[in-house]
A protein has these predicted regions:
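Extended, low-polarity transmembrane helix blocks
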Residues: 1-29, 39, 47-55, 59, ...
Length: 133
């Protein structure tokens, strides 16, 4: 059973990281579009929001893949995702927006699992903790 747990934890981290990496890289490719989208939501400082989103998504995605500071990274990504859901998918009269909102909330739930239980044994965190003992 331990082999299955190990594989599931690593797979879950990789799948979650892929979501953030793809989103962050996509933002790099279309700065004007993303800044316009941020501005259209009525948020201040679209350029700053754009840069923060890239740092959080790409940086957080990479850190999730390698399993470094996973609990902290998961909490940051969870807060970021919750904020994005509230800012961008809050038009519940539109069924599509409601679906996006609840998908984001489900992602937050998955990230909270990483925050609570850590990255699993195939991670830099596990290696670092094993070396410390």
């Amino acid at each position: 059973m331990q082999n299955l747990d190990t594989a599931l934890a690593a797979s879950g981290r990789l799948l979650m990281a892929a979501l953030f990496l793809l989103s962050g890289v996509g933002k790099i490719a279309a700065p004007a579009t993303i800044e316009g989208y941020i501005a259209s939501a009525g948020l201040p400082a679209p350029l700053l929001g754009y840069l923060v989103a890239i740092i959080v998504e790409v940086g957080g995605g990479v850190l999730l893949i390698v399993g470094f500071q996973t609990r902290i990274v998961a909490l940051i990504l969870a807060a970021f995702t919750l904020a994005a859901a509230l800012a961008f998918h809050n038009k519940f009269a539109d069924p599509n927006e409601m679906i996006h909102f609840f998908k984001d909330i489900a992602i937050v739930g998955g990230l909270l699992q990483f925050a609570a239980f850590g990255p699993g044994s195939v991670s830099l965190d596990a290696r670092r903790l094993n070396l410390a003992h």
